[in-house]
């Protein structure tokens, strides 16, 4: 079976991209365990706790990331450079994601056959 990477690179609530990516990820996890999840650029904001999407009339889907354990999604990485650029190095995120420097992250991403970006 092909290995599938889900890359979240956009901030939450400005568009439906993050929510759609999360829905696709959870649906795909029912079919395969060969999944990897990557958070890069503004996608690191997807994992911030305490968001208030109702203030912008958006649906609160961020809590759904906490279901990764239930869906056996354990290959999760976050770009260390993106965290530094946004001052988020010492934040407790809603999921456990391993920080990787950009070179290591690209190397890990290269291990996947299909890359879906949201």
UniProtKB/Swiss-Prot annotation:
Organism: Salmonella paratyphi B (strain ATCC BAA-1250 / SPB7)
Main location: cytoplasm
Keyword Transmembrane appears in the UniProt entry: no
InterPro entries: DsrEFH-like (IPR027396), Sulphur_relay_DsrE/F-like (IPR003787), Sulphur_relay_TusC (IPR037450), Sulphur_relay_TusC/DsrF (IPR017462)
Presence of keyword Cytoplasm: yes
UniProt subunit comment: Heterohexamer, formed by a dimer of trimers. The hexameric TusBCD complex contains 2 copies each of TusB, TusC and TusD. The TusBCD complex interacts with TusE.
Subcellular localization: Cytoplasm
Keywords: Cytoplasm, tRNA processing
Phylogenetic placement of the source organism: Bacteria, Pseudomonadati, Pseudomonadota, Gammaproteobacteria, Enterobacterales
Assigned protein family: Belongs to the DsrF/TusC family.
Matches recorded under PANTHER family: PROTEIN TUSC
HAMAP family: Thiourid_synth_C (MF_00389)
The protein's role, per its UniProt record: Part of a sulfur-relay system required for 2-thiolation of 5-methylaminomethyl-2-thiouridine (mnm(5)s(2)U) at tRNA wobble positions.
A GO biological-process term: tRNA processing
Protein name, UniProt field: Protein TusC
One Gene Ontology cellular component: cytoplasm
